[in-house]
């Protein structure tokens, strides 16, 4: 019967929607606004017998950054302008938003401290896991686009390698 078929299709759609909705965590829903998680790899894959690592080619994106413009922080804060519409919790959130906005001013699109630490962490892990590649006498070549946050990400990476191996 036609009614039964409609119920069946609706049921399948609901089940599919529930399955898709559970495919990501609340934290992952932030998408590009969520910092990459720090992952501790306990054990790396072993180098195949008879081989020795000699080269790393690392293509990295800029680290975590402030939102693209100061205007975005201002716009979010404006939603809290009318305090008559805010609950006590809303007033607390407003203070946090205003503090975030004030801290962000002048940093729109720039690399954040977290972004710098992310690239230092990548360099540190490479150095610890492949010390022979960064041994005295070896060299590192680095290139970046002209975008400030990209150049500063590269600088953080290289600065950390130089800290670990001053002869680079």
Where are these regions (language model features)?
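Non-catalytic terminal regions with compositionally biased, polar/charged low complexity
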Residues: 24-168
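Bacterial Sec-dependent N-terminal signal peptides
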Residues: 1-25
